[in-house]
Amino acid sequence: MNLFHDIRLLVVHALDQMVAADQLPQGLSYANVTVEPPRDPLHGDMATNAAMVLAKPSGQSPRAIAEALAPLLRADPRIAGADVAGPGFLNLSLCTSVWQGLVGQVLENGAAYGRSDLGNKRSVNVEFVSANPTGPLHVGHTRGAVFGDALANLLDY
């Protein structure tokens, strides 16, 4: 389970409801709609840029889109709050039960939690140490080696 992916699907579904209710025009692309952690944790658990991204193509103000989107998101049992901030960002707070369920999944899956098949069976070349054989080594080479090795291990996981 990827919580951010699941909530993004919820946002896209709510946007589809707005299109069906003629609150948004048909044919809008949701490709640039994101759900991510807010810059300030006091603003909630997640934030979406949906209203900001869709404002120009829909010909509406981002704040108006966010204010119409918020109640649709609040109707989902996973969402404790959906608050419009600034020009049209939407900050989302998740119910405690969502976090409890996530902890249960972590405990159930153990070391396999977070494993993904994204990019499975694809070859990736990670080049991370490029020390000049005729020059002196320095701390930057060590940093590159450690970072590259960690990245390669994550990709292998």
Where are these regions (language model features)?
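N-terminal alpha-helical targeting/anchoring segments
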Residues: 1-119
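N-terminal catalytic cores of NTP/NDP-binding nucleotidyl/phosphoryl-transfer enzymes
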Residues: 52, 56-57, 100-157
